[in-house]
């Protein structure tokens, strides 16, 4: 496990700002923690300042990420569980500030990808208009519990990786906060390439701050 660390990087002093997929340097050059083939691991009480990518968990089971803070210069990813089962990420906050040309928070918020299942994001504070990230290749059967401050419009993944999420994505007490005055999220539009294509997501206790948000094709 990893406990009680502050991780910093030279991304802070790199002359370019983050632009999504502008080049491999701004996307991936400074990556903090990458776990693969781990069982019963943990990260606790850790801060990340100025990173392209903070935590990625691949081909692992039963890990816990608890009490994590992200801050500093905006980068690509925050948390990602891919090809993994039973990952709990809780009590995390993204404090990366907004700028004139960019939303606050890392480009991708809480993320799931590549057949991951049975993962939980709990008590997560996102920035306004920051998107959760169901990144395709069929993640399914996940819970987002008490996630505050984000939206759904900028999930990652190409058309070849569709849908962004498979069945049984449950969003429990999700508090939506975006820059939209009004928007309808159609989660299964067969005629349009959308970055929020989820198979019948389930919303329980959804609330929205000053937005007129409606859904179509939810569970």
Question: Model regions: which residues?
Answer:
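Extracellular/periplasmic carbohydrate-active domains that bind, remodel
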Residues: 1-219
């Amino acid at each position: 496990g990893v406990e009680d660390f502050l991780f910093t990087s030279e991304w802070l002093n790199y002359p370019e700002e983050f632009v999504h997929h502008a080049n491999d340097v701004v996307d991936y050059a400074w990556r903090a923690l990458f776990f693969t083939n781990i069982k019963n691991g943990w990260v606790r009480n850790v801060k990340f300042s100025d990173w392209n990518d903070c935590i990625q968990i691949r081909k692992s089971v039963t890990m816990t990420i608890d009490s994590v803070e992200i801050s500093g210069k905006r980068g690509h990813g925050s948390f990602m569980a891919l090809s993994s089962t039973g990952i709990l990420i809780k009590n995390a906050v993204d404090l990366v500030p907004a700028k004139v040309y960019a939303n606050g928070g890392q480009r991708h918020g809480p993320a799931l990808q590549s057949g991951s299942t049975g993962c939980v994001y709990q008590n997560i504070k996102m920035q306004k208009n920051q998107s959760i990230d169901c990144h395709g290749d069929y993640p399914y059967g996940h819970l987002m519990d008490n996630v505050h401050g984000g939206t759904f419009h900028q999930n990652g993944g190409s058309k070849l990786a569709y849908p962004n999420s498979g069945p049984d994505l449950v969003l429990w007490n999700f508090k939506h906060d975006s820059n939209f005055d009004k928007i309808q999220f159609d989660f299964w539009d067969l005629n349009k390439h959308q970055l929020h294509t989820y198979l019948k997501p389930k919303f329980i206790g959804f609330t929205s701050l000053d937005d007129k948000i409606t859904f179509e094709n939810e569970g």
